[in-house]
Amino acid sequence: MQTVVSGIRPTGNLHLGNYFGAVRAFTQMQHEYNCYFFIADWHSLTTHPHPDDIIRSTNTILAEYLACGIDPEKATIYVQSDVREVLELYLYLNMNAYLGELERTTSFKDKARQQPDNVNAGLLTYPSLMAADILMHKAVKVPVGKDQEQNMEMARKFARRFNTIYGVDFFTEPQSFSLGERALKVPGLDGSGKMGKSEGNAIYLIDDEKTISKKVMRAVTDAGPTEPNSEKPEPIQNLFTLMEIVSTPEVYQHFDGLYNECAIRYGDMKKQLAADINAFCAPIRERILYIQGDKELLARVARLGAEKARESAAKTIDEVRHIIGFRPR
């Protein structure tokens, strides 16, 4: 069975974009692959979050993963900082990484531009840590978006370089894995682009009915079509895309027909869309709240995941130490 690795930074609640873009596919993949899903709390340190925020956000993502259907008996769900072997491999990969290639990565240049007063070494060596996360479990496939493709190429480069330096065929080059039809691009509510964590753009799985309604009713619209069967502007198309994802085909076709007839009332459409989003989120929201209240369950799942992840990681590190020439641990 092939190994798949995917991580998420604990920077807030999961939203509909996270669910339909990745998490829903993870619930299917856990039956087909040897899956490692981790919460990347070490990666979050580049922005210096408060300790309380790290703990809270980590437990939030863990609870939401479980509520969405990721099964700790079928997949390994763990917190990155619980697997200290990752840091050891991170060190070894950094020893083989060159300053110039790290400085040229798009992720580093973008982050340096966004936070010029906090251009730290963690940002520079982000590709090395990401590679350690992946190579630690000898992953064959890694579900990533286009924005991470350069870092995936770096991971492959680090794997090749390690093999070349030590004259071994140890690390397999991991391949980017497109979720294809399993993943849907969910648009944001601000009229353009995909759903993200920016204010007013996202609907979170934990949002209650009132919050969902308020967000949807504020979504950008226009004065309505003036010609039958006219092309939908992006903000309007975004609403229809959301409706296509969460509503029944009959509901979607009803409002699409009204739009094409120049008879649509956006207020009615938004009310229906809000109701359908709430109907989808409600059972997940209830499970999230229940799981968040069960601290023992969260601790047990994290402990189980750490044990399974460290078992895999220990094998890799022991072999890496032997290849490099270090004494056994």
Tell me what each language-model feature is.
Residues 110-162, 166, 187:
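Internal, conserved structured core segments that host functional sites
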Residues 42, 131-135, 191, 248:
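Short connector loops/turns at beta-strand edges and beta->alpha or beta->beta junctions
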Residues 99-103, 136-143, 247-255, 285:
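Short helix-capping/linker segments at secondary-structure and domain boundaries
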Residues 150, 156-329:
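Conserved nucleotide- and phosphate/pyrophosphate-binding catalytic cores
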Residues 2-132, 285, 289:
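N-terminal Rossmann-like or analogous alpha/beta NTP/dinucleotide-binding catalytic cores
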